[in-house]
């Protein structure tokens, strides 16, 4: 499992003698990337020790200074990209592997679930489009997390990517203040709430995928 460690950024000299307040300088902020020229504690650890990164990471960087819309979209896209890189180089059998018993989760199941969630919130709820459910029936509501034996991982991954494309188009066509009344909800929601809801959804399942991938082939990295 990959763990990101934050470290303090100091506005004075690197840790040496304690100052009068019993600490090494003044901590300005917590950062997972040192500012240019910032001294690091002489711990002998490298950047990779602090924050191991996926070896072939090509995810879009999240801007540190951004407007509300840019920041929200950037975080959602980062999590989508995280799911994508954790699916790379997996066989269909590996993707179906329930590698963290007693959990019945698999990467294939998570991908199917996220495809359905993209459609459910953006198309079926926010824009009230008359489109069928993905991987869900009244007789078998768990078709997303429990793929049938003949389910094609590559095809389902493609379906998830296609749903993300449609979701992006919907977000681009609306203001964050635009209101919708979801099909199963009794209160209005705006697009801002919905994007935050999706960020929360992806953050949860990125943690699942992180563990599942490590259980499959040992690969780790934030």
Residue ranges and their predicted role:
Residues 2, 12-15:
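Short linear motifs in low-complexity or flexible loops
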Residues 30-55, 59-61, 69-142, 182-222:
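Short, contiguous alpha-helical
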Residues 142-178, 192-198:
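Acidic/histidine-rich alpha-helical segments that form the ligand environment
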